[in-house]
Design a protein with these regions (language model features):
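An N-terminal boundary/leader segment
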Residues: 1-60, 64, 282, 286-288, ...
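Gly/Ser-rich, acidic/histidine-flanked active-site/gating loops
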Residues: 77, 89-92, 225, 242-316, ...
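Short glycine/serine-rich loop/turn segments
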Residues: 75-226, 262-264, 392-414
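Short helix-loop capping/hinge segments that flank enzyme active sites or metal/cofactor-binding pockets
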Residues: 75-95, 256, 313-374, 395, ...
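Flexible N-terminal pre-Rossmann segment of NAD(P)-dependent oxidoreductases
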Residues: 7-11, 65-78, 252-253
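Structural helix-boundary/capping segments
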Residues: 21, 40, 117, 121, ...
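Acyltransferase
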Residues: 24-32, 60-63, 271-296, 320-338, ...
């Protein structure tokens, strides 16, 4: 079979693997097509490293396998990108910050190793918000630069996993890995029109297979996790199955689903975004999904008591431990902070360094976080809910220039609010509770900017959440390729 370039670019991860396993598509041809795509779209700054030689060599090894050997590899010949804060053997891991530029780990992070063992090919490292400490991916580090949204290169892709999301949306790769602390897989997935999973944190088996704190440049051991991102829910489920060791997944039965709509996360939205989100709700309801309004009136207040204290307390010790364990070029947090290039990240680290024990961390971890987790558990149980559903962000992607020298944005002309409040408000509570979250496309604002919906599930219910996502995707559809 002969594949055109356009046909190759439109392959989902699942479709690409099936074609390569069947011998219908050579891995070398596919990788060459995607490498050319990456080079042609270098203006997006989606990647910090493009491994041309390594990717082609890996593709040649896949093509040299017999048909039976390829069939045994669940990701045979699948090109992926890995966020630049996740350790990759032989490829720079800099967290897109100057002090770590040139650092090359000697071992893959466990999640990366599982993908490679399954036949995946590392195309390169994905750009990101510097040190993962932000939600725009507007990076001023000279070796990185600001990531641009493929739907409109003058707008942010979201962050901090903006490079992974931009690369997937731009058809540079069909799938990849990001990380998520407060929303960093889900926010860029929403703004770029793709799918992103934040796995459960605290669910020992799943978390250990996804996340090794010594193999990912950290922010918070309580909240950090690696997460898969892809063009479709099936693609994300495929990567999740490889990493966790689970088997194939079928869509949930739509007519049996009870989905909660948490009132606090449906308030204060951009009007155009809310219209798209509510149109999606109507489609789900028409398909037989039962939608249940839930109050959760304490949600945001409880989250505030947890989030600030953790954000001030954990980064210093966690980053210091990673620097020492990895024999990094900079051996102190102060040494890393002194060379931070992005003003917003420098300000954040100045605050952390000035008051590393700020906030009531003990109270947050022993009282308020358990109460937040209890609120979620009671909400799921009391209403018999399978998941919660809400817009991933309060507004669509804003122009990059709007954030230059400012960290405040306006929603429909209202008084400006902090960018973190605008983009993190809806994703952060699940992060602090440790429950899984799945962002998937709901549609487009003005036919040009993606809107995402997020499904949050009970702790440890990742595979059930993905099954619901498969069912919802069949109703809502996926987004077309952006016109770049």
């Amino acid at each position: 079979m002969t594949w055109t370039v356009d046909q190759q670019l439109e392959l989902s991860a699942t479709q690409a693997v099936e074609a390569i396993q069947a011998g219908q598509l050579k891995a070398t041809d596919y990788v060459a097509t995607l490498l050319a795509r990456a080079q042609a779209l270098s203006n997006l700054n989606a990647l910090t490293v493009l491994d041309v030689e390594g990717a082609l060599a890996a593709a040649q090894r896949i093509d040299a396998l017999g048909a039976n050997e390829r069939a045994r590899l669940p990701l045979a010949g699948l090109p992926v990108v890995v966020k630049d804060n996740i350790n990759t053997r032989g490829l720079q891991t800099s967290a897109a910050t100057p002090a770590l530029e040139g650092f090359v780990p000697t071992r893959h992070a466990p999640s990366v190793q599982r993908l490679v063992d399954a036949g995946a090919i590392l195309l390169g490292k994905a750009n990101m918000h510097e040190l993962a400490f932000g939600i725009t991916s507007t990076n001023l580090a000279p070796h990185a630069g600001p990531v641009r949204n493929p739907w409109d290169p003058e707008r942010i892709p979201g962050g901090s996993s903006g490079g992974t999301a931009a690369a997937i949306a731009a058809r540079i790769v069909p799938a990849g890995l990001g990380t998520d602390t407060g929303g960093s897989t889900r926010i860029p997935a929403a703004l770029c029109g793709i799918v992103g999973l934040r796995p459960s944190v605290g669910d020992g088996g799943t978390q250990r297979r996804y996340h090794d704190p010594q193999a990912v440049v950290p922010i918070s051991h309580t909240r950090d996790t690696v997460g898969p991102m892809g063009r479709t829910v099936a693609d994300v489920a495929l990567l999740d199955a490889v990493i966790t060791g689970h088997g194939p997944l079928s869509p949930a039965a739509v007519t049996n689903l009870r989905i909660g709509l948490p009132a606090p996360l449906w308030e204060g939205l951009e009007a155009a975004l809310e219209d798209v989100a509510r149109t999606a709700l109507a489609k789900l309801e028409a398909a037989g999904v039962t939608l249940v309004p839930v109050e959760m009136s304490e949600l945001l207040a409880l989250n505030d008591r947890v989030s600030y204290a953790i954000a001030l307390h954990e980064p210093i010790e966690d980053l210091a431990a990673w620097l020492v364990a990895n024999h990094a070029p900079a051996q102190t947090v102060a040494g890393v902070a002194a060379r931070i290039a992005s003003p917003d990240v420098r300000a954040a680290y100045d605050a952390v360094l000035a008051d590393a024990r700020g906030g009531d961390y003990h109270g947050a971890m022993t009282m308020w976080r358990p109460r937040l987790q209890q609120l979620y558990a009671q909400t799921f149980a009391a209403s018999g809910l399978d998941a919660l559903l809400f817009p991933t962000t309060r507004l669509a992607a804003v122009p990059i220039d709007e954030l230059n020298g400012s960290s405040r944005v306006s929603i429909d002309g209202a008084a400006p609010i902090d960018e973190m409040e605008a983009y993190l408000r809806n994703t952060d509570p699940a992060s602090n509770a440790g429950i899984p979250g799945l962002a998937l496309p709901a549609g487009l604002v003005d036919a040009c900017l993606p809107v995402g919906l997020e499904l949050d599930g009970p702790a440890g219910g990742d595979r059930r959440l993905l099954a619901i996502g498969l069912a919802f995707e069949a109703i809502l559809g996926t987004l077309p390729a952006p016109e770049i």
